A protein has these predicted regions:
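Feature captures hydrophobic
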Residues: 499-502, 508-517, 521-524, 528, ...
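Bacterial N-terminal signal peptides
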Residues: 2-14
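Conserved beta-strand hairpin/beta-sheet module of binuclear metal-dependent hydrolase folds
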Residues: 67-142, 298-300, 305-322
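Accessory terminal helices/loops
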Residues: 22-60, 207, 211-257, 354-360, ...
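Metallo-beta-lactamase
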Residues: 65, 79, 109-121, 182-186, 190-195, 259, 263-265, 274-278, ...
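Active-site metal-binding motif and surrounding structural segment of the metallo-beta-lactamase
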Residues: 65-66, 101-109, 120-197
């Protein structure tokens, strides 16, 4: 009976990846292998940081100079009139500086910043080091950075979140925000000289809105697990090697995620497919390359248009963004949660880069890859790994295989990794000794960020959605009830507990996975069972110690820490920062902030009480959205309908029960101070917010239907009960 019950439990819970990866064994890693021996897994993560960290133990961050490196100079044509630098290990991403030939009235050469890191503090640190380098290299004594343009390669916070730090250090203000009526225009564009241009693809702001308001709260919580923010840091050399088990060692595409305050600045110029941009005297092709995000861009700097002889043909320098996602298998799906990433679109964008004659490729994560042979090898194998994952998933999907079955079938050929052993990356190149050690070249397709199983499941979901075609999944027994029935099936809680304990005492990864799955049944039925919680936590620690992918190991170890606490513990206090930073929320369009009220509504409560009030917001004057703006929030049938009012203020007032007016400057200040958010009453008594209609009690009654900010981030490792 017990054997039958446990088999039923396995069928109910799914294999959880049991057969998706080979059992732990030799230290050899491969594109399909996510687990190795515990000490070896930690050691490989430590060695992987050699892609990022400098050899100076006290200062892991450093700036790479493409003008002095023999590796970068090998195929660089003579006569180029711009210089390029790459700031590494200031955070998760890389921030690049291009020094152009154009000068200001002070004679200083103007610059372009590509990607801004994740927060203002990281950007200021990189900016200060760039300023010191600039003064040293160009014989200047500047106190501000001579920035003409900032380019976001895409919307993610580690590429946009530090923009306010750079703008604080710039010698002029940002250009006015682009008029939405003319957004997305392609063609030639010469950057203005009297302000800092903010350049990006037209979809960036919409994506920032999504992660800062729509899905930001849950993605923020999941990011804490994925990046190991609750774990002790294992950055730097360990003694002995491999002794950092349980710590956050690397983030795979960067050494760590900076924890400062993130911000945003809406762009001054966007494009759709290609922008021929001239800024700081540098002529660039800004190319749309949807891949890791649907708003990704790459920057190609043609040699012949930037000082080199015309005889060089169509060669140039490439800023590849995250089309090649650093030294790791691409994150075709991110564990923190993302909208669908099409693998087909991604490898097609890789092809766009393959078709460029690049002598050096500067990515937004990790060091540059220079010399045509290296670039083409990496791009080709990166393309092939993604296409194989995509095509073979479709092949088996069309045979009727489900996601759990697909991860057992789709195995990318090892040859795409083995080929990379001939690649020469920057840290291994002769004459480049700024990194803390040599690297494994095959890491560019080893699961240090994404993984094949993640990509397989995402591909299935993108084409046919969540339903696996077995009707048993249409209306399953609720999880808690299913767990209780499973325990009853084997006659006792104790039987399942002993099964979990026995599996935990095993030696294979499959044993530890099974222990975690059995313990999950117990914890789901009885969340206060600390013995079961401990077994599940210990199983996660054993799995985390063997996971080569830091996203996986950090999640295992963080989940174990959560399980160590009794039920009801606030494991992670809610903090309005990161993706949901109030600074970011204050910089998005007003309409999007108002729209965020809709998913904070307690629909059941509003429907039961037949709530039908209408609240009006009037913002006057506005700064970033061109004119006064009025909105109506109408409660009805457990939803709140938002109307963007197009009529007069007087007519608007007749359509609402309660009306509030404030300037955009006041709204932004209240958001930044965390004094006004969905579910809260604005400080009417301050005099900055005017109550045009209704009473303060009416306002309280209306906002009482909405959730305020939570006290804690949602628990993720403990099943809902």
């Amino acid at each position: 009976l017990l054997v039958a019950a446990l088999a039923s439990a396995a069928a109910l819970l799914g294999p959880g990846g049991l057969a998706a990866q080979p059992a732990a064994g030799a230290a050899k890693t491969g594109i399909n292998q996510n687990f190795i021996e515990p000490g070896e897994a930690t050691k490989r993560q430590e060695e992987h940081n050699n892609y990022f960290l400098s050899k100076a133990a006290a200062e892991p961050a450093h700036i790479l100079d493409l003008q002095t490196s023999p590796y970068a100079l090998a195929e660089r044509p003579a006569g180029l009139d711009y210089d390029t630098y790459s700031a590494i290990a200031y955070g998760l991403a890389t921030s690049m500086m291009v020094v152009g030939p154009s000068t200001g009235v002070d004679g200083a050469r103007r610059i372009i910043i590509i990607d801004t890191l994740e927060d203002a503090s990281a950007a200021r640190k990189a900016g200060a080091d760039y300023l010191a380098l600039y003064n040293r290299k160009y014989g200047a004594a500047l106190t501000k950075l001579p920035i003409d343009a900032i380019i976001y390669t895409h919307n993610h916070i580690d590429h946009t979140g530090g923009v306010l730090g750079y703008l604080d250090m710039a010698d002029k203000d940002a250009c006015p925000i682009e008029d939405p009526s003319v957004a997305g225009a392609d063609g030639a564009y010469v950057g203005r000289r009297n302000c800092v241009e903010i350049i990006c693809q037209e979809g960036v702001t919409d994506a920032v809105v999504n992660t800062s308001t729509v899905s930001g709260q849950i993605i923020q919580a999941r990011s804490i697990y994925m990046y190991g923010i609750k774990l002790d840091s294992g950055i730097g050399a360990a003694s002995p090697p491999g002794s950092n088990i349980g710590k956050a060692i690397t983030n795979g595409i960067g050494p760590f995620l900076s924890k400062g305050l993130s911000g945003y600045r809406m762009p001054s110029r966007t494009f759709t497919d290609q922008l021929d941009l001239s800024a700081a005297g540098v002529n660039m092709q800004v190319i749309y390359v949807p891949s890791e995000t649907n708003d990704e861009l790459a920057v190609f700097v043609p040699d012949a248009e930037n000082g080199a002889a015309a005889s060089v043909g169509k060669s140039g320098l490439l800023f590849s963004a995250e089309v090649v996602q650093g030294p790791a298998f691409p994150n075709l799906y991110s564990l923190r949660g993302t909208q669908y990433r099409s693998p087909e679109t991604w490898y097609q964008s890789v092809d766009k880069l393959r078709n460029l004659d690049s002598w050096c490729m500067v990515p937004s994560h990790g060091p540059p890859v220079c010399q045509r042979k290296n670039i083409q090898l990496l791009l080709t194998n990166f393309h092939d790994a993604i296409q194989f994952t995509h095509d073979q998933t479709l092949r088996y999907m069309n045979m009727g295989y489900t996601p759990d079955e697909l991860v057992e079938k789709v195995k990318v050929p090892d040859v795409v990794v083995e080929d990379l052993k001939t690649l020469v990356p920057w840290p291994n190149a002769p004459g480049n000794d700024s990194f803390q050690g040599p690297v494994h070249t095959e890491d560019y397709l080893i699961p240090f960020y994404g993984s094949v199983p993640q990509g397989v499941r995402e591909t299935y979901f993108g084409y046919v959605g969540w339903y696996n075609a077995d009707p048993v999944t249409l209306s399953p027994v609720p999880p808690t009830q299913a767990a209780e029935r499973m325990i009853a099936l084997v006659d006792s809680h104790k039987s399942v507990l002993e099964g979990a304990r026995s599996a935990l005492a095993g030696k294979s990864r499959e044993d530890f996975q099974w222990a975690a799955e059995l313990a999950t049944i117990l914890v789901r039925a009885h969340p206060d069972d600390m013995t079961a919680r401990k077994i599940k936590a210990d199983a996660f620690r054993k799995l985390g110690a063997r996971a080569i992918d830091p996203n996986w190991s950090d999640w295992y170890f963080t989940a174990a820490k959560e399980l160590d606490n009794p039920p009801g513990t606030c494991f992670i206090n809610y903090l309005p920062a990161g993706l949901v930073s109030p600074v970011i929320q204050s910089r998005i369009p007003i309409a999007d902030w108002v729209a965020s009220w809709t998913w904070h509504l307690d629909g059941q409560k509003a429907a039961q009480e037949k709530a039908g009030m209408a609240l009006g917001f009037w913002f006057e004057p506005t700064e970033q959205d061109f004119g006064s703006e009025g909105y109506i929030l109408q409660l009805r049938h457990g939803i709140v309908e938002i109307t963007d009012w197009q009529g007069t203020k007087a007519d608007w007032l007749t359509h609402v029960d309660v009306a509030l007016q404030m300037s955009q400057k006041v709204l932004d200040g209240l958001i930044i101070a965390n004094s006004f958010f969905p579910g809260s009453v604005p400080p009417i008594e301050s005099g900055k917010v005017t109550l045009l209609k209704g009473t303060k009690e009416d306002v309280k009654h209306f906002v009482g239907y909405f959730d305020g900010n939570p006290a804690c981030e949602p628990a993720l490792a403990v099943p809902r009960h």
